[in-house]
Amino acid sequence: MARARQEGSSPEPVEGLARDSPRPFPLGRLMPSAVSCSLCEPGLPAAPAAPALLPAAYLCAPTAPPAVTAALGGPRWPGGHRSRPRGPRPDGPQPSLSPAQQHLESPVPSAPEALAGGPTQAAPGVRVEEEEWAREIGAQLRRMADDLNAQYERRRQEEQHRHRPSPWRVMYNLFMGLLPLPRDPGAPEMEPN
């Protein structure tokens, strides 16, 4: 079992234990212990928190060193840094920053704040467009839920109306309930328990 775990192969099945789901992939092999995408420029401080605790907006953008970027003829990813807003900044246009300056400007919470689980500020990468998009999706979901509720209520009322007995059936049931049913002369009044 231990050797199978080290080699990454699945262990032999054990009797009495069901293997319903596949074994989770060991993410420790893919990600280093500190949050650094290993594509950042050398010399930048690595973030102190674990990768699973930070939202994607806090992770470094994939950038190459300036010499490589200049040799390739410009940035490799046309979108630029993830956490930088696309529109003009409220305090006016500013000169474009190098990837190292962008990386240093994006704040990363310290590990105790990230681990505390308390209320956190919005991530610096959350753009106004994304917030509007989230609001639109929320409004669409609410409208869909309201439509489904109205449709359910309409169907329920139709079912009630469809299964309502006719007045003739109500009268028949009333008379049959009031009339004594003919019984055998030896039959008891009531069935014993």
From Swiss-Prot:
Disordered, as annotated region: 1-31, 71-131
Residue(s) carrying Phosphoserine: S10
Keyword Mitochondrion (UniProt): yes
Keyword Mitochondrion found: yes
GO cellular component terms, semicolon-separated: mitochondrial envelope; mitochondrion
Predominant location: mitochondrion
Pfam family name, one: PUMA
Quaternary structure note: Interacts with MCL1 and BCL2A1. Interacts with BCL2 and BCL2L1/BCL-XL. Interacts (via BH3 domain) with NOL3 (via CARD domain); this interaction prevents BBC3 association with BCL2 and results in CASP8 activation.
Domain notes: The BH3 motif is intrinsically disordered in the absence of a binding partner but folds upon binding. Folds when bound to BCL2L1. Also folds when bound to MCL1.
UniProt name for this protein: Bcl-2-binding component 3
Organism per entry: Mus musculus
Gene designation: Bbc3
